[in-house]
Design a protein with these regions (language model features):
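Unchanged
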Residues: 72-164
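Short histidine-centered catalytic/ligand-binding loop motif
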Residues: 66-76, 185
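Acidic, metal-coordinating catalytic segment for phosphate/diphosphate chemistry
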Residues: 2-41
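A conserved beta-turn-beta hairpin within the catalytic core of GNAT-like acetyltransferases
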Residues: 60-64
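Nuclease catalytic cores that cleave nucleic-acid phosphodiester bonds
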Residues: 166-172, 176-304
Length: 304
């Protein structure tokens, strides 16, 4: 059984607006944790400088240790939005210069903390915006474990470090996925492809659970290959659409080969139930999941 602990009189307030209802302790059988609706932190990684760490003020919980910018989520706020908001409030981190790609969640049932891992696309210098920090520094990856770390971050760092630099890519065989459900798609192939693109867009925002019970949700780059009468579908915020000039299978193989050759730590997964195409992708070093694997995850997001 969990219970909320009201804020103590005189606790420091946020510099941006009044205290939020999420700024409170939650207590249960696993201990006391900050954030009525859970909490989130940002692990910002700059390939040339390392990760951004916050030296926590002595008055704060686990004061004097090094950890991630972050804090309590607002009611109804997603982990990515919350982590970016907190990092901006505490360290002036510009959300537009980051690319979040994976979320790692620790949960005790009545409370959870999500680490949002993001790559820095354009360099920036953090600034201490409130009294929660003694210092903000870019720390080389190999030096992180040498610092006196916040216990939660210290426990999670060994599993977070291997995620740095990974670039998950999802390549979708649109014709195969659309054709896996007899919902009348053959009457309007273009419209069916647009609907799939929109559902993929929602999945990218919510995150893709790659493995059961892993605690990881990925935000991959999504490439959707269309063919025939489905050609001409436009890109969306999170989905890039490629028109296959001929057979979609050949275009998918070409795209996979280019992605794998482009960066050593890219993880390329193709969604198709076509066995011949799957074998060609695996020969290149890519992973393959069937259409049902994707539609189950899309349904879990879009049917909420």
């Amino acid at each position: 059984v969990a219970r909320n602990i009201p804020p103590a009189p005189g606790e420091p307030r946020r510099p941006f607006g009044p205290r939020d209802s999420g700024d409170a302790w939650v207590e249960g059988e696993r201990g006391r944790f900050w954030g009525r609706y859970g909490a989130a932190g940002l692990l910002a990684w700059d390939p040339s400088r390392g990760v951004l760490l916050q030296h926590r003020a002595e008055w704060s919980d686990q004061g004097g240790t090094w950890g991630l910018p972050g804090g309590a989520l607002h009611a109804g706020e997603g982990a990515i939005d919350g982590a970016l908001r907190e990092a901006h409030e505490e360290a002036a981190v510009p959300a537009g210069q980051l690319k979040p790609w994976v979320m790692s969640t620790f949960s005790v049932g009545y409370w959870s903390y999500t680490t949002v891992v993001a790559e820095v696309l354009a360099p920036f210098e953090p600034q201490m915006n409130d009294s929660e920090s003694i210092a903000l520094e870019w720390v080389p990856v190999e030096s992180v474990s040498s610092a006196p770390l916040h216990p939660g971050f210290e426990a999670s760092w060994p599993s977070l470090r291997p995620l740095l630099g990974r670039q998950p890519q999802l390549v979708v065989d649109a014709a195969n996925v659309v054709g896996s459900r007899p919902d009348g798609w053959w009457r309007d192939r273009f419209g069916a492809a647009e609907r799939l693109r929109d559902r993929l867009d929602a999945l990218a925002v919510a995150g893709v659970a790659a493995e059961a019970a892993s605690g990881l949700l990925w935000s991959p780059d999504i490439l959707m290959v269309v063919e025939g009468r489905a050609r001409g579908v436009s890109n969306s915020a999170h989905v890039r659409v490629v028109d296959a000039p001929g057979e979609g299978d050949n275009e998918i193989v070409d795209q996979v080969a280019a992605l794998i050759a482009g960066q050593a730590k890219q993880d390329v997964t193709v969604i198709t139930s076509d066995r011949e195409l799957a074998a060609r992708v695996e020969d290149l070093g890519g992973r393959v999941h069937g259409a049902a694997w994707l539609t189950e995850r899309i349904d879990a997001v879009t049917d909420r």
